[in-house]
Amino acid sequence: MRKSFYSWLMTQRNPKSDEPVAILADLAFDDTTFPKHSDDFEVISRYLEDQAIFSFNLGHFDAIWEDYLNH
């Protein structure tokens, strides 16, 4: 079974990094409503577009998702 996107994302946290994946990880860490148990692209993508309490350049999300799928 695949690890949830959030669980994988937390392994990418690095407050000193300017990499988009590290930025998203730090933002998601502070967001108590982030869908922590999901591994579904549509659920995560829709959340980031419509419900996230933070602003993130979604142009980077597809590449981050590909990294998640390939881990």
Curated annotation (Swiss-Prot):
Cited InterPro entries: UPF0346, YozE_SAM-like, YozE_SAM-like_sf
Pfam family of the protein (one): YozE_SAM_like
Family, similarity comment: Belongs to the UPF0346 family.
Name of this protein: UPF0346 protein SUB0487
Organism encoding this protein: Streptococcus uberis (strain ATCC BAA-854 / 0140J)
